[in-house]
A protein has these predicted regions:
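Sec-dependent N-terminal signal peptides
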Residues: 1-5
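C-terminal motif of bacterial Sec signal peptides marking the signal peptidase cleavage site
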Residues: 8-11
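N-terminal, intrinsically disordered, polar/charged segments of Gram-positive cell-envelope systems
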Residues: 14-62
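A cross-family detector of function-defining hotspots
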Residues: 22, 27, 60-96, 118-168
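A short alpha-helix capping/helix-coil boundary motif
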Residues: 34, 92-93, 102-104
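Surface-exposed aromatic
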Residues: 39-42, 76-78, 105-112, 143-148
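Short, recurring structural edge motifs at helix starts
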Residues: 43-47, 110-115, 138, 150
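A generic structured-segment signal
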Residues: 47-49, 56-61, 100-103, 111-130
């Protein structure tokens, strides 16, 4: 729960706007909440999704959550909801009346990234799969930014201890 609150507090990016007719919703700053994933994506039960997506279809595909927690957002307007599923957490915001994914957190080694990296892999394995990390990386975190989002590998020594997909 504490990690979820940290992720919610660290989230940043533009607030979502009212959905339009069609598959995408455009924010005032030009970003879109979409039904099509961009950037680094995650596949679970055969369904590909990512951050900045309208959450309806991904949440439906994931099934009934084990638990969920809703609170007033401190990073956006509206409310944030964290959905807890087996092996992953999905965080959404509903500022304009629809939910948009702003964070996906991989909880254990039963799930992996699109390139096969999971909790417990080494720094060398992450770099072999994703290349050299962004300059904002450190000894405790490898960061890869792409298309308005970041894929973050938190480290404990030389091993991946958690994986998060976040909006920039």
């Amino acid at each position: 729960m504490a990690l979820t609150l940290v992720l919610a507090l660290c989230a940043c990016g533009g607030a979502p706007a009212n959905p339009t007719t069609g598959n995408d919703a455009t924010e005032p700053n030009g970003n879109t909440g979409s039904t099509t994933p961009v950037g680094y994506t995650f596949t679970y039960n055969g369904y590909q999704f990512g951050v900045d997506m309208i959450a309806d279809a991904p949440l439906e595909n994931l099934g009934e959550p084990k638990d969920q927690y809703t609170s007033e957002s401190c990073a956006f307007g509206g409310e944030d909801t964290v959905y807890y599923f087996n092996s992953i957490q999905v965080s959404t915001n509903n500022e304009y009346g629809y939910e948009r994914i702003y964070s996906i957190y991989l909880e254990d080694d039963l799930v992996s990234t699109e390139k096969g990296i999971s909790i417990g892999n080494t720094v060398a394995q992450v770099k072999a799969a994703y290349g050299e990390p962004d300059a904002s990386s450190s000894d405790s975190c490898l960061i890869y930014a792409k298309d308005g989002m970041k894929l973050r590998f938190n480290l404990n020594g030389d091993k991946v201890s958690s994986i998060a997909y976040d909006m920039l």
